[in-house]
């Protein structure tokens, strides 16, 4: 086999550029296996240099069913790469492996992909090929017994890949169409309303303190008497909690009602929201 044919074969096998493949063939003395290893080492070197850059594009990959559903964020630097066939193929396969490993990133990274390589090695190769920083972000699996899981994808890139994804877990023994419709609508509501927590008492205390400080700063120079300022502050904080807790948010499909009102109207005694997660690329 001529060196030109070896370079062509190496390019097909690794996706690396002509110049890199040509140099690898020369360095390896024409040994294809050694050439692949040389490119892999160089790929790791290139990848490490890219890890200091920002990766605010990418996709959210969702996989699973009502019994078990998983979500994982795969970030890159540009939307162009996020839509690249190799990136999309990697993300789709990764989503299935993530569900199999219940979002345990340590196990996921060691899992074998269809190419026979581990996820972490495949990621390094993809970084070298794409020329961008690519990272795995947030990951979560819902699989609580007795629960039903739902999801909603917004701005779909392809199939189960999107720019925004929501997974929602409902606890109920009821398997009616009403429950399924509510699960889907609730996921859509969460996508649009971006609640901080299920209920006001579960909102992060640091976030509440930050909001309290902003309100205090706003009222500091208002000239209002202290007792009036305190009442205004309390009102603003109560409104903040109400608007950011899922159960007390205005229902997107019928804003005069709250989410908790819709649950009551369904009249399903054991129905409750277990958990939810909303991930949006760039946030």
Curated annotation (Swiss-Prot):
Where are the annotated coiled coils located? none
Function, please?
Associates with the EF-Tu.GDP complex and induces the exchange of GDP to GTP. It remains bound to the aminoacyl-tRNA.EF-Tu.GTP complex up to the GTP hydrolysis stage on the ribosome.
Q: Which NCBIfam families match?
A: tsf
May I have one GO cellular component term? Answer: cytoplasm
Q: Which gene encodes it?
A: tsf
What keywords would UniProt list here? Cytoplasm, Elongation factor, Protein biosynthesis
From which source organism is this entry?
Pelagibacter ubique (strain HTCC1062)
Q: Which family does it belong to?
A: Belongs to the EF-Ts family.
Question: What InterPro entries does the database record attribute to this sequence?
Answer: EF-Ts_dimer_sf (IPR036402), Transl_elong_EFTs/EF1B (IPR001816), Transl_elong_EFTs/EF1B_dimer (IPR014039), Transl_elong_Ts_CS (IPR018101), UBA-like_sf (IPR009060)
Query: HAMAP family from the xrefs?
Result: EF_Ts (MF_00050)
Query: Quick one: where's region Involved in Mg(2+) ion dislocation from EF-Tu?
Result: 78-81
Where does it primarily localize?
A: cytoplasm
* UniProt-annotated location(s): Cytoplasm
Q: Which CDD domains does the UniProt entry name for this protein?
A: UBA_EF-Ts
For this entry, the protein name equals Elongation factor Ts
In its UniProt record, a GO molecular function of this protein is:
translation elongation factor activity
């Amino acid at each position: 086999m001529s060196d030109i044919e070896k370079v062509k074969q190496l390019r097909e096998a690794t996706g690396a550029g002509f110049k890199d493949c040509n140099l690898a063939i020369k360095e390896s003395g024409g040994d294809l296996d050694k050439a692949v290893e040389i490119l892999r080492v160089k790929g790791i070197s290139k990848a490490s240099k890219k890890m200091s850059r920002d990766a605010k594009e990418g996709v959210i990959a969702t996989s699973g069913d009502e019994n078990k559903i998983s979500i994982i964020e795969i970030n890159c630097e540009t939307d162009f790469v996020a839509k690249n066939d190799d990136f999309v193929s990697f993300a789709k396969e990764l989503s299935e492996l993530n569900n199999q490993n219940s979002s345990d990133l340590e196990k996921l990274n060691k899992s074998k992909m269809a190419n026979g390589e581990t996820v972490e090695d495949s990621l390094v190769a993809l970084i070298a090929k794409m020329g961008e920083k690519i990272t795995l972000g947030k990951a979560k699996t819902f699989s609580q017994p007795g629960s039903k899981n739902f999801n909603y994808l917004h701005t779909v890139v392809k199939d189960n890949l999107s720019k925004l994804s929501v997974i929602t877990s409902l606890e109920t023994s009821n398997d009616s169409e009403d429950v399924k419709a509510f699960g889907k609508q609730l996921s859509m509501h969460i996508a649009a309303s971006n609640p901080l927590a299920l209920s006001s008492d579960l909102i992060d205390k640091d976030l509440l303190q930050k909001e309290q400080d902003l309100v205090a700063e706003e009222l500091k120079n208002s000239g209002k008497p202290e007792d009036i300022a305190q009442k205004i502050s309390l009102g603003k904080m109560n409104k903040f909690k109400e608007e950011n807790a899922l159960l007390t948010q205005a229902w997107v499909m019928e804003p005069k009602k709250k989410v908790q009102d819709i649950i009551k109207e369904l009249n399903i005694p054991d129905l409750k929201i277990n958990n939810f997660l909303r991930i949006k690329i760039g946030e």
